[in-house]
Every structure is written in C-alpha cells, then in structure tokens.
Amino acid sequence: MSGTGKDKAGYLVGFIVFICVIPFFMFLLAGRIDPGAGRMICCIVLAAAGIGLSVWSIVYMKRVGQGNPLDAFDHEIGPRTKRLMTDGPYRICRNPMLLGVFIFYAGLQILLLSWKALLLFAAFVLIMLYQVKMEEQRLERDFGREYLEYKKKTPALLPDLNSFKKH
C-alpha cells in the first residue's frame, strides 16, 4: 500500500474503531437511557472537547510530525512520525490524542450512567495504557535522547495544570 493509502487507511481505522465501534458498544451495553438536560449538556461539552483535542493532535501530528496516529502495538498501520512532537497539544501531555478520546468516552459515560459501559471504558483504558507503554519504547528507539528529555518533563496522559501557567 502506498504512503497515501496507508495514511487514509490509518485515519479510517481510527475513526471506525474509536468514534463508531466503541461508542456503539457502550450504548448497546447501557440499554435504555433517559438523561436529564444537565447530563446531556455535560456529555456534549466533554465529547466536543475530547474530539477537539484529538483532532488538534491528529492535525498537528500530520503537519509537524509528518506521520499518522495509527501505530497499534508496534504494528505500523499508517506512516509513523518522522519528527518528535513536543509543542502544540503535545506540550500538555505526551498522549493528547488518547486523552481526548478518554474525555470523549467520559462524556458518553456521564450520559449513559451504565456500569456495563463503564467496564468497557475501563477495559479500553487498560488496553490503551499498555499500547502507550509499547509506543514509548518505539519512540525511545526512534528519537533517543530527544524523546527521553521530552518524557522527563512532560506527563504521559494527565496534564500538569501548572504547565498552563508557563505557556
């Protein structure tokens, strides 16, 4: 598959899995939902913020990192980044795209209030934390000392709120 084909395939797989399939199963597991206006507003705000952060991260990765976000368990589905990204959304945490997805799912969970959907969300979080660990090993191999310095000063997933004061 050509670079452009791999790129498109990576985006398509990511969209289908993270924005369609997992939320579909969260809703399926939740069964009947009857949210009030407050929960609906909270869900919409969190979902929009999460998707916004993820999209910003993807666009930044394409433009600055010159790569594609889909590299699953050390298998290259889309072209890997050629440059280490340490600015933009990547200055607040090393995995802003994943943080955005977690925020999106948290919004859905507030809407659904389902322990079954919460278990799916928790399983997804555990799988993705394992993926992050594998990805960080690859980034250390690919970018060496530069990545280790970035890793030392930037949190993996949960932003240090004090870092916003510095920027």
Language model region names:
Residues 92-99:
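Histidine-centered phosphotransfer motif of kinases
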Residues 1-87, 99-167:
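Membrane-anchoring alpha-helices and their flanking helix-loop junctions
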